[in-house]
């Protein structure tokens, strides 16, 4: 998520918006359109959320070369590949999700990708995860979902799935 935050900081600053790091992490998983709507409304600054989202996504794509795999998560993905259907359920856009998967050469591990552009109600609503389960033909109650943000954990629980907070995995790995 540090690359996302760098892209957000660069883009929001150009439009006079303030986006503190703690707020960024609190809104993790929320669609970029919704984040911008919230920030502009709270700060009384009018912006074109769609245009600014595309600017943020373009900045992210510039920075993507610095991205890498999360080893603890990729171990699970590699062990599960071919044994369990897997999907990505992201609050991001198609462009950024596909971009990072292609950059890390891991797109082939996933049977479906659902982004904020595929559903009506983004995280913390369960729609993103429910659509991912539907696309891989697995009942939600039989799904385990990995997430790195509080909003996403709430969405997983609302979908009736088992959540795994990858932040706990990362903290344990760094000890």
Residue ranges of model-derived segments:
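Active-site neighborhood of HAD-like aspartate-dependent phosphohydrolases
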Residues: 1-23, 169, 173
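Asp-based, Mg2+/Mn2+-dependent phosphohydrolase catalytic module
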Residues: 78, 94-175
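Metal-dependent phosphoesterase signature
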Residues: 18, 38-75
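Helix-loop "lid/cap" segments that line or gate small-molecule binding pockets
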Residues: 11-12, 31-45, 100, 133
